[in-house]
């Protein structure tokens, strides 16, 4: 009887391992990680992306600045933030990128820390890249007085 239980457990573990491996292969299928500086081994801070357009004007008070370049392939995870390689306090002078705002170092209680606050770490929650494309739906938005083009 013990031999039967051992075989059953071994079959279950083999099936689980096959499921995990096939899931990982399926998840990574078609993803090109070679352009990511974290994977390609490019020296941190050495990448200088060419600007695709000038900084765009703001349309309302406290609008987060828009991103004037592509962010395709950028990794922003809990362990790494590709945006900070150019916009971080340590690197913005050498890259020519705008420095991250001091407000990004404040926590939810208003205390200023030495590192980017967790609630401000994921840049693409507020800052969005722009593309010169036709809108999907009509837009009648007009900038606040004194803002916009």
From Swiss-Prot:
Residues spanning the signal sequence: 1-27
Entry keyword annotation includes Lipid metabolism: no
Post-translational modification: Binds 2 heme C groups per subunit.
Effect of deleting the gene: Deletion leads to reduced levels of formate- or glycerol-dependent activity after anaerobic growth in the presence of nitrate.
Gene3D superfamilies, sorted: Flavocytochrome C3, Chain A
Similarity comment text for this entry: Belongs to the NapB family.
Name of this chain's protein: Periplasmic nitrate reductase, electron transfer subunit
Species: Escherichia coli (strain K12)
């Amino acid at each position: 009887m013990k031999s039967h239980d051992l075989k059953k457990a071994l079959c279950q573990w083999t099936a689980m391992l096959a499921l995990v491996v096939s899931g990982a292969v399926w998840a990574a299928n078609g993803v090109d990680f070679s352009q990511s500086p974290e994977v390609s081994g490019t020296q941190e801070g050495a990448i200088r992306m060419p600007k695709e357009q000038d900084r765009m004007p703001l349309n309302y008070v406290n609008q987060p600045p828009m991103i004037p370049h592509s962010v395709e392939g950028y990794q922003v995870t809990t362990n790494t933030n590709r945006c900070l390689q150019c916009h971080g306090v340590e690197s913005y002078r050498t890259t020519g990128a705008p420095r991250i705002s001091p407000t990004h170092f404040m926590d939810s209680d208003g205390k200023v820390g030495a590192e980017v606050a967790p609630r401000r770490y994921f840049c693409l929650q507020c800052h969005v890249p722009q593309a010169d494309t036709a809108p999907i739906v009509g837009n009648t938005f007009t900038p606040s007085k004194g803002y916009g083009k």
